[in-house]
Amino acid sequence: MVYTKNDQKSINFLKVFDFWSFFVILKKMKGEITMKKVELNKKKKQDALLNTAYQLFTEKGFQKTSISDIVNEAGVAKGTFYLYFKDKLDIRYKLIAKKSAEVFKHAYQELQKQSIDHFEDQLIFIVDQVIGALNANPTLLKLISKHLSWGMFKNSLVEPIDDAQRNIYDIYMDLLNNSGHEFDHPEVMIYMIIEMVAGSCYNVILTGEPVSVDELKPYLYQSIRLIIQNHIL
């Protein structure tokens, strides 16, 4: 095939254009990779601070742990701490939210493996999984139980815990909507359940008083069922 001068110019232009397009795409990909590395590095530092705070809060206690203790143990500069947290109370708040989300995530994953159709049974299964996790880790219980309130449940546990990017509150509302029932003040209902579970299990798990966890469960779960039934319209 014979090319004219104009054909050759067009071919040369396309070669330059293709090379430039490839260069632009490559540069964009490099920028995206760099951004991902930056985000991963930021998350790594934040996780290091959270994990260190958890270790120190549970070993030394919240009051005896300083921000300097946390950053020194985590191996980051003090200024880095303030990039992620306002103060010591803020890191505890976020730490409780993170640990609580992990517990609920595991409970919900276990629920998905079961064939449980009724809302009451689904909620009690989740509660049972949460109690089991806290019973197996009293240190974690000490950190989150006294702070696992309705406000924490609704406003702080925003980290997605399933493939649909739903958080704990979203999942609770979906379970309600799929229950086949309408509920009177569902937020009041879950508030009462959370407060009852947190309050009644704390001393039972830590001291075994007035009964063991296994002895408490039937009474606790019956109370949960009654709360749910009283809210069905």
Give the ranges of each region predicted by the language model:
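Short secondary-structure transition hinges
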Residues: 132-170, 206
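Flexible coil/turn residues that form the inter-helical turn or adjacent wing/linker of helix-turn-helix
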Residues: 63-64, 84, 209
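Hydrophobic/aromatic-rich alpha-helical bundle segments in the mid-to-C-terminal region
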Residues: 177-223
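Short hydrophobic/aromatic patch on the recognition helix
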Residues: 75-85
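Alpha-helical DNA-contacting segments of helix-turn-helix folds
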Residues: 92-102, 106, 144, 164
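Amphipathic alpha-helical packing segments from all-alpha helical-bundle domains
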Residues: 105, 153-180, 187-191, 218
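Hydrophobic alpha-helical connector segments
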Residues: 94, 98, 108-136, 193
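Basic, helix-initiating cap at the start of DNA-binding domains
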Residues: 1-60, 65-76, 90
